[in-house]
Protein backbone atom coordinates (compact mmCIF):
# COMPACT_ATOMS: atom_id res chain seq x y z
CA UNK A 1 0.00 0.00 0.00
CA UNK A 2 1.22 3.48 -0.82
CA UNK A 3 2.60 5.65 1.96
CA UNK A 4 1.08 8.83 0.59
CA UNK A 5 -1.66 9.69 -1.90
CA UNK A 6 -1.77 12.73 -4.17
CA UNK A 7 -3.45 14.49 -7.06
CA UNK A 8 -2.71 17.47 -9.30
CA UNK A 9 -4.89 20.55 -9.65
CA UNK A 10 -4.80 21.95 -13.19
CA UNK A 11 -6.65 24.56 -15.21
CA UNK A 12 -6.76 23.07 -18.68
CA UNK A 13 -9.09 22.07 -21.50
CA UNK A 14 -9.10 19.53 -24.31
CA UNK A 15 -7.74 21.37 -27.34
CA UNK A 16 -9.27 18.89 -29.79
CA UNK A 17 -12.71 19.43 -28.24
CA UNK A 18 -12.28 23.18 -28.78
CA UNK A 19 -11.28 22.58 -32.42
CA UNK A 20 -14.34 20.36 -32.89
CA UNK A 21 -16.54 23.01 -31.24
CA UNK A 22 -15.31 25.72 -33.60
CA UNK A 23 -15.80 23.41 -36.60
CA UNK A 24 -19.44 22.97 -35.54
CA UNK A 25 -19.76 26.74 -35.07
CA UNK A 26 -18.43 27.41 -38.58
CA UNK A 27 -20.80 24.82 -40.03
CA UNK A 28 -23.78 26.38 -38.25
CA UNK A 29 -22.78 29.88 -39.39
CA UNK A 30 -22.71 28.71 -43.01
CA UNK A 31 -26.12 27.00 -42.70
CA UNK A 32 -28.15 29.44 -40.61
CA UNK A 33 -30.37 31.74 -42.65
CA UNK A 34 -29.83 34.80 -40.44
CA UNK A 35 -26.03 34.42 -40.59
CA UNK A 36 -25.63 33.76 -44.33
CA UNK A 37 -23.97 36.60 -46.20
CA UNK A 38 -22.59 38.23 -43.05
CA UNK A 39 -18.94 37.49 -43.93
CA UNK A 40 -18.42 36.04 -40.46
CA UNK A 41 -15.03 34.43 -39.85
CA UNK A 42 -14.07 32.42 -36.76
CA UNK A 43 -10.35 31.67 -36.40
CA UNK A 44 -8.35 29.85 -33.74
CA UNK A 45 -4.69 30.25 -32.92
CA UNK A 46 -2.65 28.89 -30.02
CA UNK A 47 -4.34 30.89 -27.26
CA UNK A 48 -7.08 33.03 -28.87
CA UNK A 49 -10.29 32.79 -30.86
CA UNK A 50 -10.88 35.62 -33.34
CA UNK A 51 -14.38 36.50 -34.55
CA UNK A 52 -14.75 38.96 -37.44
CA UNK A 53 -18.20 39.95 -38.67
CA UNK A 54 -20.21 42.92 -39.92
CA UNK A 55 -22.62 43.68 -37.05
CA UNK A 56 -22.84 43.49 -33.29
CA UNK A 57 -26.03 41.42 -33.52
CA UNK A 58 -24.21 38.81 -35.61
CA UNK A 59 -21.28 38.89 -33.18
CA UNK A 60 -23.61 38.22 -30.25
CA UNK A 61 -25.24 35.35 -32.16
CA UNK A 62 -21.85 33.78 -32.90
CA UNK A 63 -20.83 34.10 -29.24
CA UNK A 64 -24.07 32.36 -28.22
CA UNK A 65 -23.40 29.55 -30.71
CA UNK A 66 -19.85 29.13 -29.35
CA UNK A 67 -21.19 28.88 -25.79
CA UNK A 68 -23.88 26.35 -26.77
CA UNK A 69 -21.48 24.13 -28.71
CA UNK A 70 -18.84 24.33 -25.94
CA UNK A 71 -21.36 23.19 -23.33
CA UNK A 72 -22.40 20.24 -25.51
CA UNK A 73 -18.73 19.22 -25.80
CA UNK A 74 -18.16 19.47 -22.02
CA UNK A 75 -15.91 22.52 -22.23
CA UNK A 76 -16.14 24.93 -19.31
CA UNK A 77 -17.32 28.41 -20.27
CA UNK A 78 -14.75 29.75 -17.80
CA UNK A 79 -11.98 29.14 -20.34
CA UNK A 80 -13.31 32.03 -22.46
CA UNK A 81 -12.18 35.56 -21.59
CA UNK A 82 -14.06 37.90 -23.94
CA UNK A 83 -12.09 40.91 -25.12
CA UNK A 84 -13.28 44.29 -26.33
CA UNK A 85 -15.12 44.65 -29.63
CA UNK A 86 -12.95 46.54 -32.14
CA UNK A 87 -13.87 48.17 -35.44
CA UNK A 88 -11.57 47.05 -38.24
CA UNK A 89 -11.42 47.96 -41.94
CA UNK A 90 -14.45 50.20 -42.11
CA UNK A 91 -17.64 48.42 -41.13
CA UNK A 92 -16.22 45.13 -39.77
CA UNK A 93 -16.19 44.21 -36.08
CA UNK A 94 -13.59 42.00 -34.47
CA UNK A 95 -13.57 40.36 -31.06
CA UNK A 96 -10.73 38.38 -29.52
CA UNK A 97 -11.54 35.65 -27.01
CA UNK A 98 -8.56 34.73 -24.84
CA UNK A 99 -8.41 31.05 -23.84
CA UNK A 100 -7.55 30.69 -20.15
CA UNK A 101 -5.11 27.90 -19.44
CA UNK A 102 -2.89 27.26 -16.42
CA UNK A 103 -3.14 28.53 -12.87
CA UNK A 104 -1.52 31.91 -12.25
CA UNK A 105 0.85 32.19 -9.28
CA UNK A 106 -1.38 34.42 -7.12
CA UNK A 107 -4.43 32.19 -7.68
CA UNK A 108 -2.32 29.11 -6.90
CA UNK A 109 -1.30 30.73 -3.61
CA UNK A 110 -4.96 31.43 -2.73
CA UNK A 111 -5.93 27.82 -3.47
CA UNK A 112 -2.96 26.51 -1.49
CA UNK A 113 -3.75 28.74 1.50
CA UNK A 114 -7.43 27.80 1.61
CA UNK A 115 -6.60 24.06 1.44
CA UNK A 116 -4.00 24.41 4.20
CA UNK A 117 -6.43 26.40 6.37
CA UNK A 118 -9.12 23.72 6.05
CA UNK A 119 -6.92 20.62 6.25
CA UNK A 120 -3.82 20.64 8.46
CA UNK A 121 -2.60 17.19 7.35
CA UNK A 122 -2.56 17.98 3.63
CA UNK A 123 0.58 19.20 1.86
CA UNK A 124 0.25 21.51 -1.16
CA UNK A 125 3.12 22.37 -3.49
CA UNK A 126 3.02 24.74 -6.45
CA UNK A 127 4.70 23.37 -9.59
CA UNK A 128 4.58 26.04 -12.28
CA UNK A 129 0.95 26.21 -13.43
CA UNK A 130 -0.22 23.16 -11.44
CA UNK A 131 -0.61 22.31 -7.78
CA UNK A 132 0.29 18.96 -6.22
CA UNK A 133 -1.91 18.07 -3.24
CA UNK A 134 -0.74 15.13 -1.12
CA UNK A 135 -1.81 13.43 2.09
CA UNK A 136 -1.73 10.08 3.85
CA UNK A 137 -5.53 9.95 3.88
CA UNK A 138 -7.62 9.42 0.75
CA UNK A 139 -10.64 10.82 2.57
CA UNK A 140 -8.86 14.12 3.21
CA UNK A 141 -7.95 14.33 -0.47
CA UNK A 142 -11.55 13.71 -1.50
CA UNK A 143 -12.66 16.52 0.80
CA UNK A 144 -9.94 18.73 -0.72
CA UNK A 145 -11.33 17.98 -4.20
CA UNK A 146 -14.77 19.15 -3.01
CA UNK A 147 -13.20 22.32 -1.63
CA UNK A 148 -11.43 22.94 -4.95
CA UNK A 149 -14.72 22.60 -6.84
CA UNK A 150 -16.20 25.24 -4.51
CA UNK A 151 -13.18 27.50 -5.05
CA UNK A 152 -13.62 27.12 -8.81
CA UNK A 153 -16.87 29.10 -8.60
CA UNK A 154 -15.40 31.99 -6.59
CA UNK A 155 -12.12 32.22 -8.56
CA UNK A 156 -13.84 32.00 -11.96
CA UNK A 157 -11.30 29.62 -13.49
CA UNK A 158 -11.82 26.01 -14.56
CA UNK A 159 -10.08 23.62 -12.15
CA UNK A 160 -9.66 19.86 -12.50
CA UNK A 161 -8.19 17.20 -10.25
CA UNK A 162 -5.90 14.90 -12.27
CA UNK A 163 -3.57 11.98 -11.53
CA UNK A 164 -5.25 10.81 -8.35
CA UNK A 165 -2.76 8.30 -6.91
Swiss-Prot record:
One Pfam family, short name: DUF520
Disulfide bonds: none
InterPro entries per record: DUF520, UPF0234-like_C, UPF0234_N, YajQ-like_sf
Protein origin, superkingdom: Bacteria
Family affiliation: Belongs to the YajQ family.
Classification via NCBIfam families: PRK05412.1
Stated role: Nucleotide-binding protein.
Protein name per the record: Nucleotide-binding protein PMT9312_0481
Organism: Prochlorococcus marinus (strain MIT 9312)
Keywords of this entry: Nucleotide-binding
UniProt GO molecular function: nucleotide binding
GO cellular component: cytosol
